[in-house]
């Protein structure tokens, strides 16, 4: 995972998991509203009366309708990253 996504993914996941309504502003000024159904590295699937696949490169701002408790998600994500790094170092040391 890219370093720049270490905040983005847990934040979007918290919005998705808690089904928080969001307003997504595109770089051209268009405002989209709905709930985040899913997302990946390149797109967000926004659900309202219809599903819209929104490319992340077209997004300027994501505004949740209420505050997001993403702190625990971010903290968990960093713990998992640390554990993965420790496992890699341990594996490297065992092969030496």
Curated annotation (Swiss-Prot):
Keyword set, alphabetical order: RNA-binding, Stress response
Gene3D superfamilies cross-referenced by the UniProt entry: 2.30.30.100
One GO term of the biological process aspect: regulation of DNA-templated transcription
Molecular function terms from GO: RNA binding
The Sm domain, residue ranges: 9-68
GO cellular component terms, semicolon-separated: cytosol
Cited CDD domains: Hfq
Keyword set includes Transit peptide: no
Keyword RNA-binding on entry: yes
InterPro entries cross-referenced by the UniProt entry: Hfq (IPR005001), LSM_dom_sf (IPR010920), Sm (IPR047575)
Record text on subunit structure and interactions: Homohexamer.
Family: Belongs to the Hfq family.
Function recorded in the entry: RNA chaperone that binds small regulatory RNA (sRNAs) and mRNAs to facilitate mRNA translational regulation in response to envelope stress, environmental stress and changes in metabolite concentrations. Also binds with high specificity to tRNAs.
Protein name: RNA-binding protein Hfq
GN (gene name): hfq
């Amino acid at each position: 995972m890219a370093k720049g996504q270490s905040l983005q993914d847990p934040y979007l996941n918290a919005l998705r998991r808690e089904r928080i309504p969001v307003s997504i502003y595109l770089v051209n000024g268009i405002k989209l509203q709905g709930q985040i159904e899913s997302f990946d590295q390149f797109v967000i699937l926004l659900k309202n009366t219809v599903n819209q696949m929104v490319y992340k490169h077209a997004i300027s701002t994501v505004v949740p309708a209420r505050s997001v408790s993403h702190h625990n998600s971010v903290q968990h994500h960093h713990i998992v990253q640390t554990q993965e790094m420790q496992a890699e170092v341990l594996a490297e040391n065992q092969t030496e």
